[in-house]
Amino acid sequence: MEGVTIVDHPLVQHKLTLVRDKSISTKSFRELIKEIGMLLCYEVTRDLPLADTVIETPLATMHSAKIAGKKLVFVPMLRAGTTFVDGMMDLVPTARVAHIGLYREPHSFAAVEYFFKSPSDLGERLAIVVTPVVATANTAVAAIDRLKERGAKDIRLACLIAAPEGLERLRGLHPDVPIWTAAVDEGLDENGFILPGLGDAGDRAYGTR
């Protein structure tokens, strides 16, 4: 699908297999999501602009490259997105972090917002929405809608797994938002959960039901 990149690096796929396993502990689940977040961040930021700069090494003066002209804001979707984004922050510690709290109404699957906090200069930043799962995409669409309302112009999305139905809806409503995912699963069940999926990422990360 155009605009969707599947990150098939062996390390990502290995760690995703471990994450899917229902027998792992909450601690292992959180640690693995953080590690995958770091690996996906590497791919999502691959095309950041570079500028030449002059530095002094211990032995000589040299020209070298630094990221320039692009400020970042990570946008984890609560709850499990906060664990996912920790690995990204390890790579880009100077990035800002916005938070969006959305839950999916269990009967209609509609997205309900309960929290939103972001930097005031969203229009000047590359916003990377971070969510473990894109199932129906209702919450992802609502998050992107909200970011655009607040002035964000350059938005990307990173997730662990996605359903074809969710990707189609997200790309249809926001074709300007590219997506990076570790896997595209078979589809959705009657309750809107991804099959085979990985379960409820928030519950598995924090030991709730």
Swiss-Prot record:
GO terms for molecular function: GTP binding; magnesium ion binding; uracil phosphoribosyltransferase activity. Uracil binds at I194, G199, D200, A201. It catalyses: UMP + diphosphate = 5-phospho-alpha-D-ribose 1-diphosphate + uracil. 5-phospho-alpha-D-ribose 1-diphosphate binds at R79, R104, T131, P132, V133, V134, A135, T136, A137, N138, T139, D200. Allosterically activated by GTP. GO terms for biological process: UMP salvage; uracil salvage. Gene3D superfamilies: 3.40.50.2020. Pathway: Pyrimidine metabolism; UMP biosynthesis via salvage pathway; UMP from uracil: step 1/1. The keyword Nucleotide-binding applies. Binds 1 Mg(2+) ion per subunit. The magnesium is bound as Mg-PRPP. Its cofactor is Mg(2+). Disulfide bonds: none annotated. Keywords: Allosteric enzyme, Glycosyltransferase, GTP-binding, Magnesium, Nucleotide-binding, Transferase. Its EC number is 2.4.2.9. Belongs to the UPRTase family. Catalyzes the conversion of uracil and 5-phospho-alpha-D-ribose 1-diphosphate (PRPP) to UMP and diphosphate. This is Uracil phosphoribosyltransferase. The lineage of its organism: Bacteria, Pseudomonadati, Pseudomonadota, Alphaproteobacteria, Hyphomicrobiales.
